[in-house]
Structures are given as structure tokens and as C-alpha cells.
């Protein structure tokens, strides 16, 4: 009996994710309700609440499912090269229509504590942890110095992308990414020791 219930549950789960993304992309986070997501998915509101505690978490999970591994750190010859490639992937994502969805969610999160928490927990913190691990690997490889604050370095690298995404202050193009990466290296790359 449990085996027949599981596929139905998975189908409902997937339908809810698709409905949430479709509605939010079309109308914006604030304009969509849990009831509308459930109705669009063809499920009851309680079915939605069995999977997620609130609208913010279902919307974030729908976004994450859409993205998949699109902005994950790629395999490369070194941690630094993986970091450089991932910056380019993140920039391409922000330039896409999905970047507009991130911009909208960050904007809405300023006045919605549940969305702000879901955005941090499901989007921002896992990505920061991936960058942190990558930078630590580059330090272990001897490519980067180990005497800097990694969280500040993450903000320097990725904060500029979010700044341009949110404020439209400039293009998030390949040249901008290379400049950002090179400036990061200029301040953090390991140097040969100098004789005294």
C-alpha cells in the first residue's frame, strides 16, 4: 500500500514545484498565495504543507530544482581554475531570465522575513559554503595565501555580481568576471617568500 502512495506523493511534489515557479515567474512572489500554488498544482493546500512549511520554502525549492547543478563548481586542473569557471557560470546564470527571478526574490526578501530566511538557508548559505571549500582547497594547494578572511573574500568576489544584478550598475559580462577574478588574485595569491 505504501508503494502506491509514494509515486502519487512525488507527482504532487513535482506539480507543486512547477506551479510555484510558473506563478512566481509570471506574477511575482508577493502576488502569489499558497492557495493559488496548490490550486495550480491540482492538490490541496494541506498536501503542500506536508512538504513545505510556507510559500517561501516551496518557491526556493522550485528555483533550486530548476537550476540543478548549473552553477556548481566544475572539475578543473586546480581549485583556482574551478573558481574562475564557476564565476563565469554564475554570471551566465544572472544574465539569463532566471537571474531576473533571483533579483525579484532578493527584492521581496527585504520585506518578507520568511522569504529572507529561505533565501539565505536554501540559496545563499550553500553557495557560500561551496566557495569557502573551494578557497580552502586553493589555500591547501598553495595557490592562495592563508592569512585572509575567507568570508570577506567571498563577499568581494560574489558581492559585486549581486550588486550589478540588483542595481543594474553595469554589465555582468565576461570582462567584468575576469577583472573581478584578477583583482581577487592580486590581493590573495600566494607569493614566493623573499630572503631577508
Predicted regions and their residues:
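Basic, helix-initiating cap at the start of DNA-binding domains
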Residues: 1-27, 31-40, 46, 57
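Short loop-to-helix capping motifs
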Residues: 54, 108-113
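Amphipathic alpha-helical packing segments from all-alpha helical-bundle domains
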Residues: 92, 96-100, 104, 114-141
